[in-house]
Amino acid sequence: MATYFVGDLQGCYDELQLLLERVNFNPTQDKLYLVGDLVARGDKSLECLRFVKSLGDSAQTVLGNHDLHLIATALGIKKVKPRDRVDAIFNAPDFDELIHWLRHQPLLVHNKKLNFLMVHAGISPDWNLETAKSCAAEVEQILQNGDFHYLIENMYSEQPDRWSPDLQGLARHRYIINAFTRMRFCYLDHRLDFACKSPLKYAPTELTPWFNLGNPLYKQIPIVFGHWASLVDEPTPKGVYALDTGCVWNNRMTMLRWEDKQIFTQSAVKNYSDF
């Protein structure tokens, strides 16, 4: 049995299949973890959703910002962006079933046995493990069982940009969603920055990657995440695994085998910017 993690798919189905073939992935024995953003901008988002869903307990994803945006468009809250290339999902006979399944995916996975945390973007520099898990569960409960339409409709805001345990209601839930699905750089006072998406060497000096802000949690448990394609080939601290290597931006898809930490990569098989 082997455990694999793969970076953001974003509709890049063919590259995923090539990687799974290379490692001889066997869903009856192995497990595949995905760091979120299964959809958007690649040409096979529908295939990605169907495939991951079809794996059942042999796969586990977390919600990314593009996944949440797909739910928002499914609810009619946002319009479909042509560049996201998700029309096939909306025309699919299993559309409702796929959105229902996606809505029931977590924001955070903590595997005690294998000793890892998996998120899409990151974990707030102000959270310990207990807070991170409780915050994730709080929003997941609403997405899966509560008034998720109201939450999705009101999640599009960059405020508040700083965590406080006193946050309540939508403000609290927006921060939780943004930390788990959108965070990259932070200010030294731990405020989230949403503007800078550049490689580290081009970032303003007042900004620091979230994983360099000294949260003890970052050293206690290995963290696997995606979201930040411009981190490709950038060093990260020990135990912090950045797996989004920009396949949909004509770079490559990255897979990590957990047991021996071996990396497998697959270059983009097509120029997605040509579509």
Swiss-Prot record:
Keyword check for Cytoplasm: no
Alphabetized InterPro entries for the sequence: ApaH, Calcineurin-like_PHP_ApaH, Metallo-depent_PP-like
EC annotation from Swiss-Prot or TrEMBL: 3.6.1.41
Keywords: Hydrolase
Molecular function as annotated in GO: bis(5'-nucleosyl)-tetraphosphatase (symmetrical) activity
Keyword Hydrolase: yes
Pfam families in UniProt: Metallophos
UniProt superkingdom: Bacteria
Reactions the enzyme catalyzes: P(1),P(4)-bis(5'-adenosyl) tetraphosphate + H2O = 2 ADP + 2 H(+)
Top-level enzyme category: hydrolase
Function field: Hydrolyzes diadenosine 5',5'''-P1,P4-tetraphosphate to yield ADP.
Family: Belongs to the Ap4A hydrolase family.
Protein name per UniProt: Bis(5'-nucleosyl)-tetraphosphatase, symmetrical
Naturally occurring in which organism (per UniProt): Haemophilus influenzae (strain 86-028NP)
Taxonomic lineage from the root: Bacteria, Pseudomonadati, Pseudomonadota, Gammaproteobacteria, Pasteurellales
Gene coding for it: apaH
